[in-house]
A protein has these predicted regions:
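Nucleic-acid modification enzymes, centered on SAM-dependent nucleic-acid methyltransferases
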Residues: 1-104, 114-381
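Class I SAM-dependent methyltransferase "Motif I" SAM/SAH-binding loop
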Residues: 105-109
């Protein structure tokens, strides 16, 4: 046993690693990397791209404000994540091409992305308005979180993108051939592709204790208004999200293999596109109800196991004691049944991939899509 090694078997540490670039233990190749990079510095000096007399004139004093509409930033959500152009400003000021930058709490590896981007003429010009100090910096990034490494390794790694495109498109085609019907509706006898669906919860009236549709009572669709206070259709009492409870019903969960109290959701709107154009479908017809029933039966037959969220069930985060997490105990609770069928099928296809580098990139593609697939999805242009 050596200092810095995680507690675990050697085989497990090796399986978690991607040597020589990433190791789940002190990296024995680190000194070799640094020695090679130091040699490269000499070549850069001969080419006039760096100076042995480089001096920093003073601290970086400008205000930094970077927009977050950046593909690197938006690919995955991660706390403390910073757009890489913000980091580039510091690197271009404090370092020169070939310098080695170390980030020991790297998170998703945006320091590494910034170090590479310092060699991108377009990005440097957008930041500095001139080409001075342009050139790649070398980055050593480290983080304890496996999810952070998963993101960082792809953002800072080299992959065969042609191979990835072919495989990812093949997976999508295969899944759509099998489950494309989930995202199809019928409009005036014409097949249409579902862009998104709106589902509504049910509310328990604080006065008569009867349950009713939140959408039907709170939403004025014609005027694009969602009322903060809405009336119970049965007794006329005023209700609101602050004072009224959500309706829960006992369901058998086929994935958890147990009866559970869960929110019943009702389809209220379908946004679609067809040959005739785009539109909204407010009244579901029999083909929609048949499709929903087919989704239910397909979901019941899924061959997958339940995974407790963070291994804690509902006792996660800072607000679970208020009951906010009620009904969100397992990972599959975060998905509608329709989307979970698709997510499960795509993941099964990725798991079949034997090329480990390609599999890593496919998993990156898969995890990057989750923010648009689970119930926490929101409007984010």
């Amino acid at each position: 046993k050596m200092e810095g090694f995680p507690i675990g078997e050697d085989d497990d540490i090796i399986n978690l690693s991607d040597p020589p670039y990433y190791t789940a233990c002190p990296n024995p190749w680190l000194n070799d990397f640094i020695a090679e990079w130091e040699e490269e510095k000499n070549e850069l000096e001969k080419e006039g791209k760096r100076s042995s007399n480089f001096m920093v004139d003073g601290p970086y004093a400008a205000d930094i404000s970077e927009g977050k509409n950046n593909p690197f930033y938006n690919a995955h959500s991660y706390h403390t994540k910073v757009p890489h152009p913000a980091i580039m400003r510091y690197l271009l000021h404090y370092t020169q091409p070939g310098d080695i930058v170390f980030d020991g709490f790297a998170g998703t590896g945006m320091t590494g992305v910034a170090a590479n981007a310092c060699n991108n003429h377009k990005e440097v010009m957008a930041i500095k308005g001139q080409k001075s100090n342009i050139g790649k910096r070398k980055a050593i990034v480290s983080d304890l979180a496996p999810y952070a490494y998963h993101i960082s390794s792809v953002l800072n790694g080299k992959f065969n993108l042609t191979q990835f495109r072919e495989k990812s498109n093949s997976i999508l085609e295969k899944v759509l051939d099998k489950f494309g019907w989930i995202y199809q509706t019928n409009v005036n006898g014409e097949k249409a592709e579902i862009i998104y669906s709106v589902l509504s919860e049910r509310i328990i009236c604080k006065e008569c204790l009867k349950d009713f549709s939140y959408w039907d009572s709170a939403v004025d669709f014609d005027h694009s208004i969602v009322s903060a206070i809405y009336l119970c259709p049965k007794c006329g009492a005023e209700n609101s999200n602050k004072i009224s409870d959500k309706h829960f019903k006992t369901f058998y969960d086929p994935i958890a293999n147990e009866s559970r109290l869960l929110k019943p959701y009702e389809y209220k709107l379908i946004s679609y596109k067809s040959i005739s154009g785009r539109g909204l479908k407010l009244n579901l017809d029999q083909t929609d109800h048949d499709r929903i029933n087919k989704i239910e039966s397909t979901y019941e037959r899924l061959n997958t196991k339940s995974i407790k969220f963070l291994k804690k069930g509902t006792e996660w985060g800072d607000t679970w004691r208020k009951g906010i997490h009620k009904g969100f105990e397992y990972v599959h609770d975060f998905y509608t049944k329709a989307n979970f069928i698709i997510v499960n099928e795509i993941l099964d296809e990725i798991k079949k991939e034997e090329d480990l580098k390609l599999k890593e990139l496919l998993m990156f593609w898969f995890t990057a899509s989750q923010s648009r697939l689970h119930k926490m999805n929101r409007y984010a242009p």
